[in-house]
Amino acid sequence: MYAIIETGGKQIKVEAGQEIYIEKLDVEAGETVTFDKVLFVGGENVKVGSPVVEGATVTAKVEKHGRAKKIIVFKYKAKKNNRKKQGHRQPYTKLVVEAINA
């Protein structure tokens, strides 16, 4: 069984036991998170939400918080001696999906 959830402005396909990386949540490591915005549940009985599936939840355990690899943002204007170099590391939360309840 799998489900499509919405979190952090993104839609993510999840299955039980899967590790996922999502936008940072304000939750301590080791706690359990419940997602109520379940858009789709697939498997033997398919349920499509409009926009969400009523009564469906996905529970996951927070494994750790971290920051992604650094990306370099370099802005440049030709012939104007205008250069700006900036780095960015996006924070994330690593989850392990425990159960899909539909």
From Swiss-Prot:
PROSITE patterns: RIBOSOMAL_L21. GO terms for molecular function: rRNA binding; structural constituent of ribosome. SUPFAM superfamilies: L21p-like. Keywords: Ribonucleoprotein, Ribosomal protein, RNA-binding, rRNA-binding. It holds the Pfam family Ribosomal_L21p. GO terms for cellular component: cytoplasm; ribonucleoprotein complex; ribosome. One of its GO terms (biological process) is translation. Part of the 50S ribosomal subunit. Contacts protein L20. PANTHER family: 50S RIBOSOMAL PROTEIN L21 (PTHR21349), LARGE RIBOSOMAL SUBUNIT PROTEIN BL21M (PTHR21349:SF0). This protein binds to 23S rRNA in the presence of protein L20. Belongs to the bacterial ribosomal protein bL21 family. This is Large ribosomal subunit protein bL21. It comes from Bacillus cytotoxicus (strain DSM 22905 / CIP 110041 / 391-98 / NVH 391-98).
